[in-house]
Amino acid sequence: ARLYRNEIAISAVDTPVPRAIASQASDELLNISGILASFVLYPGAEGEVMISARSIGSCNVQMVLEPLGGGGNAATAGAQIRGSTVRDVLRELVASIDKFYET
């Protein structure tokens, strides 16, 4: 995982993992001191890019993921993006995080 904006952990992997494992990883990243939000990106079984997101702070993960087609609530959200790569979705995610913090 990498640290972004001093309070967000982002983990992106190129290997498919079960959804439950990605959700657990999102939860566990919040246990790191100072981390208020986490995003785990991974390829899904059908080639889509999956995102599992969690927050315990001011970062509303639902609002961050809505522009990417995701949903959920302020503390727990997810997205499935078809026709893209983990790397490209990571760039879109970072842009969406930046936009969230600018508003």
Can you say where each PLM-predicted feature lies in the sequence?
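Hydrophobic helix-and-loop "lid/oligomerization" segment in the mid-to-C-terminal part
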Residues: A1-L68, G72-T103
